[in-house]
């Protein structure tokens, strides 16, 4: 099974507020989520949600989290983005064009999915009823810039799961 391909940005630096995340990652597994949120993302009150406030922007936090995930032998991220992000014009939100460019550079080599923002929030709310969700709230003030990381098993994939299920049906 191939390891997901992540090339850290040169902006990567340790995020002090996320030291606890390093200890938490070995406990997390497939079906858990990590969200790196913009400042206006609402506080979720589901019991399965843990929120961490960091004094940094989304992109350096993303670098740090992806680097930590890359060190884990058991999990890999599936990335989810707000579908709205691709449609925001620079004159509506200054800095969004550069943010998008830098974000997509960082995500090169990772599976990226998109859904409308409200659907992603609903997905997180549903998941948090049974599984741990870690929300890392940043100081980024650009709309629809949250990055949602759905954790998946790093040593098993959908194709192998289908083959397993097919052989069990025989």
Task: Give a label for each model feature.
Residues 72-105:
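Ordered, amphipathic secondary-structure segments that act as subunit-interaction surfaces
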Residues 2-58:
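Long, hydrophobic N-terminal alpha-helical segment
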């Amino acid at each position: 099974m191939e390891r997901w391909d992540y090339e850290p940005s040169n902006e990567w630096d340790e995020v002090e507020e996320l030291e606890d995340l390093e200890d938490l990652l070995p406990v997390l597994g497939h079906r858990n989520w990590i969200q790196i949120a913009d400042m206006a993302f609402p506080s979720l009150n589901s019991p399965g949600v843990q929120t961490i406030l960091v004094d940094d922007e989304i992109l350096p936090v993303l670098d740090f989290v992806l680097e930590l995930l890359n060190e884990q032998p058991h999990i890999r991220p599936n990335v989810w983005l707000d579908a709205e992000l691709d449609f925001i014009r620079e004159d509506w939100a200054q800095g969004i064009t550069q943010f998008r460019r830098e974000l997509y550079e960082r995500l090169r080599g990772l599976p990226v999915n998109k859904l409308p923002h409200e659907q992603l929030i609903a997905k997180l709310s549903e998941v948090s009823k049974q599984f741990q969700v870690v929300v890392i709230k940043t100081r980024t003030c650009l709309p629809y810039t949250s990055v949602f990381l759905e954790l998946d098993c790093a040593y098993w994939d959908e194709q192998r799961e289908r083959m397993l299920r097919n052989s069990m049906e025989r």
